[in-house]
Amino acid sequence: MLIIETLPLLRQQIRRLRMEGKRVALVPTMGNLHDGHMKLVDEAKARADVVVVSIFVNPMQFDRPEDLARYPRTLQEDCEKLNKRKVDLVFAPSVKEIYPNGTETHTYVDVPGLSTMLEGASRPGHFRGVSTIVSKLFNLVQPDIACFGEKDFQQLALIRKMVADMGFDIEIVGVPIMRAKDGLALSSRNGYLTAEQRKIAPGLYKVLSSIADKLQAGERDLDEIIAIAGQELNEKGFRADDIQIRDADTLLEVSENSKRAVILVAAWLGDARLIDNKMVELA
């Protein structure tokens, strides 16, 4: 496995792969890798000749400096996991390598609408940071496919739109959420939970599933469903942050024409902001 930290060396390797006619898959990450990331890697390996994993804690997508400062940096352990998975290339640049003149004056990519609604409304600038770094990685790696987790549902929708709008010739693959046996969605942020909070955490998925059951049973008073779900989360020990039921294809409000809904839940548990989602077919 090759570990590359600079743009010139990355370009050199990508040129070589292109000359050899290899099909390249990219898995963009911020490191602190868990089994959910490994599922992305496995999907990439199944679809391409060469797998490139990027590890970069992107300062542009953090709306709170304290979150950026405490985000775990575990490069050595991450590389050991990726080596066992037989990943071909790891791109692990420094912030200086990606943003040589800082982030304030760096050119950015913004996806109107999707970047400022829902999760974007509570985290100003977050999705602009995501679309900027992902577009830069697409330009650098020139992948045929790129794999993203469906846990970050809005992020996946945003990237799909950016790819369509910008004309990137890249297949975007959404990989289903990987869960612990108790239902908790795997996330790097789970590492912020205490042992006691970890016991409470699966309650998020239980509330999510309860909302899904109500929708599948034909209930359509969304305001009431959301209000009850918020109460349930708070009673379980969470601080409900945002609960949305949206059209899964547009992320707009559910209408009589909506065929699928997505339930998006965000809640605080101690210092960890946990997110999860679930799709529901609407009869």
From Swiss-Prot:
Annotated Gene3D superfamilies: HUPs, Pantoate-beta-alanine ligase, C-terminal domain
InterPro entries, per the entry: Cyt_trans-like, Pantoate_ligase, Pantoate_ligase_C, Rossmann-like_a/b/a_fold
Keywords: ATP-binding, Cytoplasm, Ligase, Nucleotide-binding, Pantothenate biosynthesis
Catalytic reaction annotation: (R)-pantoate + beta-alanine + ATP = (R)-pantothenate + AMP + diphosphate + H(+)
Enzyme class: ligase
Active site residues of this protein: H37
Pathway as given in its UniProt record: Cofactor biosynthesis; (R)-pantothenate biosynthesis; (R)-pantothenate from (R)-pantoate and beta-alanine: step 1/1
BP term (GO), one: pantothenate biosynthetic process
UniProt-annotated location(s): Cytoplasm
GO MF annotations in UniProt: ATP binding; pantoate-beta-alanine ligase activity
Record bears the keyword Ribonucleoprotein: no
EC number(s) reported in the record: 6.3.2.1
Pfam families: Pantoate_ligase
Task of the protein: Catalyzes the condensation of pantoate with beta-alanine in an ATP-dependent reaction via a pantoyl-adenylate intermediate.
Note: The reaction proceeds by a bi uni uni bi ping pong mechanism.
Sequence similarity: Belongs to the pantothenate synthetase family.
Protein name (record): Pantothenate synthetase
Name of encoding gene: panC
